[in-house]
Amino acid sequence: TISVTEDEVLGIGGENIQGFYAAMKYFQSLDNPNNKKFVEAFKAKYGPKSVIGDVTQAAYLGPWLWKMTVEKAGSFDVDKVAAASPDIEFKEAPEGYVKIHKNHHLWSKTRIGQSLPDGQFKLIAESPKLIEPDPFPKGYQ
């Protein structure tokens, strides 16, 4: 599956989906200092049983990337912000380092995880470097 995150597993029950694979850029179980800090703060705010999926982490990134882009643009003007967005880097992202491409999508790593009975994902594979975003690939039209 490519659309089941920790959020959905919470409702389905980890024991009911154990062993399924998911391709995401973020799993709550990622072992890096940024993610550990993020998960700890999230659980302190929303409770120890709360989970964080790829979509939640992406929602967290948005305001930070917007802030950095507005600061670079020196303006809230949408055209100036859009023009300033390429090459904005977020080194403290829970998923790890990300960067905005000139097409306004993120360079990020891709990961494959296997679901565990506790509702988390075991990291099985990770791209060795950031993947260039291609939101409109030729040949799919």
What would you call each of these model-derived segments?
Residues 1-141:
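Extracytosolic ligand-binding ectodomains
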